[in-house]
């Protein structure tokens, strides 16, 4: 049975699943869907075409599904999709998509999004991502699984953050950050492999050592990027992590942090 506070304002057109808790002064718009077991603490406002999965917890003064901060947007039917088991802390803003992408801002499963984070239109967030306080993602940013984004980080539009990457606090990121690496700085640069994070996630010593060798060839041997990629393909075992790393780099459009 749902637990809905008497001060909450919920559109009769909204689709609220079973066992949802909606606390005081929450506002839920017409085209909102909320999955089983999700909890809105209080003062949460959800608008637009927004789908929220199961067992999410959303804290006070978070807003989801409002129009994108894009002057080209004229009210087209775009939306937000949020998966299961996400924690979204106080004052987070998650905007619906613009018309320049596929029409959705997407957040996957099991993410931890800390207070005052901004996720702009058309962003694609994977699974098990951690975003610390006041991290800001511009439009069309992509963040792969298990990435960590530090506090007060600003990420330029269309930039990609690779899986298991770590971005240090106060950084400005304007180029793609490769998977498994660490980046930091006002114009973010790479500072090595995220070895500690990889060990915590259960990567074997053998895999980490292969990634370290790839990192050295790609980012420290002062080779042209294509030459470095060819050398990694020729000299190192093509384990899944190496394949993903190289495919990510080869797909870049904004350049790669080095």
Curated annotation (Swiss-Prot):
One of its GO terms (molecular function) is acyl-[acyl-carrier-protein]-UDP-N-acetylglucosamine O-acyltransferase activity. GO terms for cellular component: cytoplasm; membrane. Pfam families: Acetyltransf_11, Hexapep. InterPro entries: Acetyltransf_C (IPR029098), Acetyltransf_C_sf (IPR037157), Hexapep (IPR001451), Hexapep_transf_CS (IPR018357), Lipid_A_LpxA (IPR010137), Trimer_LpxA-like_sf (IPR011004). It comes from the Bacteria. It is found in: Cytoplasm. The keyword Transport does not apply. It catalyses: a (3R)-hydroxyacyl-[ACP] + UDP-N-acetyl-alpha-D-glucosamine = a UDP-3-O-[(3R)-3-hydroxyacyl]-N-acetyl-alpha-D-glucosamine + holo-[ACP]. It is an enzyme of class 2 (transferase). Its EC number is 2.3.1.129. Pathway: Glycolipid biosynthesis; lipid IV(A) biosynthesis; lipid IV(A) from (3R)-3-hydroxytetradecanoyl-[acyl-carrier-protein] and UDP-N-acetyl-alpha-D-glucosamine: step 1/6. Keywords: Acyltransferase, Cytoplasm, Lipid A biosynthesis, Lipid biosynthesis, Lipid metabolism, Repeat, Transferase. Disulfide bonds: none annotated. Its main location: cytoplasm. GO terms for biological process: lipid A biosynthetic process. The keyword Acyltransferase applies. Homotrimer. Involved in the biosynthesis of lipid A, a phosphorylated glycolipid that anchors the lipopolysaccharide to the outer membrane of the cell. Belongs to the transferase hexapeptide repeat family. LpxA subfamily. PANTHER family: ACYL-[ACYL-CARRIER-PROTEIN]--UDP-N-ACETYLGLUCOSAMINE O-ACYLTRANSFERASE, ACYL-[ACYL-CARRIER-PROTEIN]--UDP-N-ACETYLGLUCOSAMINE O-ACYLTRANSFERASE, MITOCHONDRIAL-RELATED. This is Acyl-[acyl-carrier-protein]--UDP-N-acetylglucosamine O-acyltransferase. It comes from Thermodesulfovibrio yellowstonii (strain ATCC 51303 / DSM 11347 / YP87). The lineage of its organism: Bacteria, Pseudomonadati, Nitrospirota, Thermodesulfovibrionia, Thermodesulfovibrionales.
